[in-house]
Amino acid sequence: EFFKTFNALIDQNKQLVISADRSPSDLDGVEERIKSRLGWGLVADINETTFELRLGILQAKVEQMNMYVPKDVLEFLARNIKSNIRELEGALNKVTHTSLIGRSMTVESASETLIDLLRSNHRSVTIEEIQKKVAEFFNIKVADMQSNRRLRSLARPRQIAMYFAKKFTQKSLPDIGRNFGGRDHT
């Protein structure tokens, strides 16, 4: 059904925007013909937003809400909430809500209000960084660790890197497995 809809829209010179956490060729459970069609278009890797963009979004949101939030509080939010825009706006809503219950809006009160969110937003390590460090330590290539080759010399480094990936990232076991030769460790 999606395939037919996709083709019908393309035939009508319509544009589609499809979002995923990986490239079309890496999508599991998607037919090859759909992967192929998705590959026709522009595939863009969207990276973390800049401080200036996050601050601009916050300022626009405050203006839209017709509220006053001190500049240092907005800068604090923009500097510390980097994960995604929904979380950034949610943090702004929490901070502005505290002012509605009579607390002053300061960096300190914002920090107290958002303590759990701020704790979870500290930079986390990526699977790629883990693979690089483990490969460097064992003097092997990252590509070998990512391959499906079952050499004894690769097994231990791969196991260690997968253990670290599970321990230090929020990735699921299937996601981790995909980064290590397509293994399914569910």
UniProtKB/Swiss-Prot annotation:
Keywords from the UniProt entry: ATP-binding, Cytoplasm, DNA replication, DNA-binding, Lipid-binding, Nucleotide-binding
One GO MF term: DNA replication origin binding
SMART domains on file: Bac_DnaA_C (SM00760)
Pfam families reported for this sequence: Bac_DnaA, Bac_DnaA_C
GO biological processes: DNA replication initiation; regulation of DNA replication
Stored CDD domains: Bac_DnaA_C
Sequence segments annotated as region (Domain IV, binds dsDNA): 100-186
Nucleotide-binding recorded as keyword: yes
Region (Domain III, AAA+ region): 1-99
Classification via Gene3D superfamilies: 1.10.1750.10, 1.10.8.60, P-loop containing nucleotide triphosphate hydrolases
InterPro entries: Chromosome_initiator_DnaA-like (IPR020591), DnaA_C (IPR013159), DnaA_dom (IPR013317), P-loop_NTPase (IPR027417), Trp_repressor/repl_initiator (IPR010921)
Location of region: Domain II: 1
Record's comment describing the protein's domains: Domain I is involved in oligomerization and binding regulators, domain II is flexibile and of varying length in different bacteria, domain III forms the AAA+ region, while domain IV binds dsDNA.
Family: Belongs to the DnaA family.
Biological role stated in the UniProt entry: Plays an essential role in the initiation and regulation of chromosomal replication. ATP-DnaA binds to the origin of replication (oriC) to initiate formation of the DNA replication initiation complex once per cell cycle. Binds the DnaA box (a 9 base pair repeat at the origin) and separates the double-stranded (ds)DNA. Forms a right-handed helical filament on oriC DNA; dsDNA binds to the exterior of the filament while single-stranded (ss)DNA is stabiized in the filament's interior.
Name of the protein this chain belongs to: Chromosomal replication initiator protein DnaA
Organism the protein comes from: Wolbachia sp
Gene name as annotated: dnaA
